[in-house]
From Swiss-Prot:
Toxic component of a type II toxin-antitoxin (TA) system. Upon expression in M.smegmatis inhibits colony formation. Its toxic effect is neutralized by coexpression with cognate antitoxin Rv0909. Does not exert its toxic effect via translation. This is Toxin Rv0910. The keyword RNA-binding does not apply. SUPFAM superfamilies: Bet v1-like (SSF55961).
């Protein structure tokens, strides 16, 4: 299983950073791998919430069924994803206070038979760049 992490300083108070990081309706604006939601988004997020989306890494799209397995505002949430071809994804989003703002971080764990071997390494490398770009987009969109 590939594990990738990234974080960025955000000049917003943690509560505001959390509000944006947990707003699924705005993921298309900053999260580069997110393409479109394939299910109706709930009005309230909570543990057990299920949503579906298309994600794309290195030109390879996949439909992912996400389940929120941890939801603790304004600190973080964890989504477990099951995709086509046995792809498994875990997305851990965290917001922590920092002097003059907050730190927003994402950890992504990738696994499943479709991501074994060289393909998995290629996807992991591309996703590492996507995480960095997404975090920078987050700052630009919400604090720029």
């Amino acid at each position: 299983m590939a594990k990738l992490s990234g974080s960025i300083d955000v000049p917003l108070p943690p509560e505001e950073a959390w509000m944006h990081a947990s707003d699924l309706t705005r993921y298309r604006e900053w999260l580069t791998i997110h393409k479109v939601w394939r299910s109706k988004l709930p009005e309230v997020l909570e543990k057990g919430t299920v949503v579906e989306s298309y994600v794309e890494v290195k030109g390879m799209p996949n439909r992912i069924k996400w389940t929120i397995v941890r939801y603790k505002p304004p600190e973080g949430m964890t989504l477990n994803g099951d995709g086509v071809g046995g792809v498994k994804v875990k997305l851990i989003a965290k917001v922590a206070p920092k002097e003059h703002g907050s730190v927003v971080s994402f950890d992504v764990h990738l696994g499943g038979p479709a991501l074994l071997g060289p393909i998995g390494m290629i996807v992991a490398a591309a996703l590492r760049a996507d995480i960095r770009e997404s975090l920078q987009n987050f700052v630009t969109v919400f604090a720029g």
